[in-house]
């Protein structure tokens, strides 16, 4: 059966336009009835009324690594519950493990590019920070294994003089964006949120964590991590989730509307340099629902 995603997504985008209009918002409010309430055991999400200040210059190099394919990706469901932090639920599939390991050469390529730049002086130290969700932590661990996978990669690391910290440092600030009443539902329900994000980065429809709230915690997390490596010039890998990393890359780059983040989607196991200018962003793609398994 052909997926209805490409057909329904434009409809939801049109509906999103109505969501921000007082004359049509009542129609979307009725959609809420189809979803269960927020789990009372889940912590409440901060309501943020505005986007944070621009991210100031940082002392270290940053790289963004999305987790490999997870069992939740294969099930085709949204997995964002805070109770997943520290658990083994929704970890990597065999393909996800492979994607995590295969991210290592690309990461080394980015680090090598930064070593050749005239900007921040490098310490050649590499650190991995990760969301506490299993799929992210396991991806960081697999990337580390990938850096030791064969003689060719090991030789590159030695020639570059990299000193890789083998410990994966967990940080709650890198957790998945919380999707409130949509948590555990099918991927297509992203269509109730992403289009509205483009109009209003502060919205909390369905009790989701807003783009502004994610940007605010990412800003705090980056500044905190940067302060822990005050000497500067370190190479820091942030292993996290699609929405969080997409928001991070456009916020860090200084794009005018961070709510457009979903048009710069990360693939499973994809690593990117965290650029600080808009011209470092990849080409934007039309808003589409994610496919099952991604």
Predicted regions and their residues:
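Short glycine/proline- and acidic residue-enriched helix-loop micro-motifs
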Residues: 192-213
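Active-site-proximal alpha-helix that buttresses catalytic centers in soluble enzyme cores
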Residues: 44-160, 209-212
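N-terminal chloroplast transit peptides
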Residues: 1-27
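Short, well-ordered beta-to-alpha junction loops that form the rim of enzyme active sites
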Residues: 68, 130-134, 173, 218, ...
